[in-house]
Every structure is written in C-alpha cells, then in structure tokens.
Amino acid sequence: MDEKVSFRSYLKATRGVIGKFLSTPSFFAIPRINILLFIATFCTTYIMNGLGYAICIMVILFAHEMGHFIMCRKYRVDASWPFFLPFPSFFGTLGAVIKMKGRIPSKRALFDIGVAGPIGGLIFAIPITLIGLYLSEVQPIPKDATSYLGLGEPILFSLFSKMMVGEVSEGFDIILNPIAFAGWAGLFVTALNLMPIGQLDGGHVIYALIGKHSAIVYKVGIGIFFLFAIFVFKGWILIAVLLL
C-alpha cells in the first residue's frame, strides 16, 4: 500500500466528518438496543471495579468504536452505532462492536477504518493510564497470595509505569487505582484487537495490506487466540468461536 494513515490525517478526517453527520436528522436516532447495552455495560463495569473504572473504560471503548464509525462515514460505508457487550467478568465487559453493511470501496478505506479504532482508543487510554498511575500506590506484595492478583504489562503500560512511578523494589508492586486499571485494560484490549484475525481490527488491516495471503496469517492468529482464550481468559472463548 502506497499510502498510510497517519494521526494527522485521522484528525483531519474526524473534523470534517463529525460536522457532516452531526447535521443529519438521523444522528440522534440511536436504536434502543444500543442504549440498553450501553447502560448494561456501564452497570457491569461499575459493579466489577467501581465508578472511576466504569467511566474510563466506557470512554476508551466508545472512542475506539467511534474511530471506526467516523472513518466509515468518511468512506460512505453504512455503519451502526456501537453495540456494547456487558459481561460480569474481570473487565466487566467483552468490549464493543459496530456493524458495517455494504461493500468497502477500497483497500485504503479498509485500512483506514481498521486502524482508526485503535488510534481513537489510544487517544484516551494513554492519558487515562498516566493519570491512574499517578493516583496509584506502591505497596508490599501481600503475604497471602490468594488476596493478590498480579497483572501482565503491555509494553506501553510498562513504559508509563517506569515514567510515573519509577523502579519498584523487590517485594513491592504498584497497587493500581481503578482508573489505572481502566487504562491497563484499554491498552490490553487495543493490543489484542490488533491481532491479525478475521473480524478484529488487525484482520482488516492485514487483509488491506497483503490481500488473500492474509489467510495464512489468519489461521496462525486464530490458533493463538484460542490458546489465549483457553489458558488466560475463558471469557473470550465465545468470541474465538464467532471469529471462525
């Protein structure tokens, strides 16, 4: 592909398209099911991790899906409002999706639509992570291992931790503020979404880049996703099945 989407082009497209669809009569005609799922997801995230977490993770997910939505409008691809997926789990949600109808006009359009979601999510996930880490505390790791849950760190989160907290001594760890946990979840879901699998953003991007050869990458990616779902977080087994 000769052209690549950039942060600047994303913002430029956002300004023009937002003005266009805000002026249409159907802009505020959000289907009831989308509203109910949004409320249900806010409730499950609030119940699992509190108000600060719920607000921040919903903002990140909404920004991610609106990135796709805005690019769909730019390329005149019919797209639904986001469907949030409530789930009483570790995160309180399985994320959110939008439905696209009709033919995507070009590989450039597919690439831009696919990559705009992660860009939109990161715009909010990064400052939320930094603020959350600033509010977090370094404490001794509890002797009772059953009361302690250690989290893996996405590369960006690890860099932000060192920047905001510094090196943590042995026997200590960062006890994440709920806002920091929302940032961690946002970075984690963004990384997961960029896996080159079918209907995930990474699947769209890899197809736009290499076309039919992406089938090989897809098979490897779906295998890795199933292993992740089985051994790390069983809540994604249903999603893995739907991606087949």
Q: Model regions: which residues?
A:
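Hydrophobic transmembrane alpha-helices and their immediate loop junctions
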Residues: M1-L244
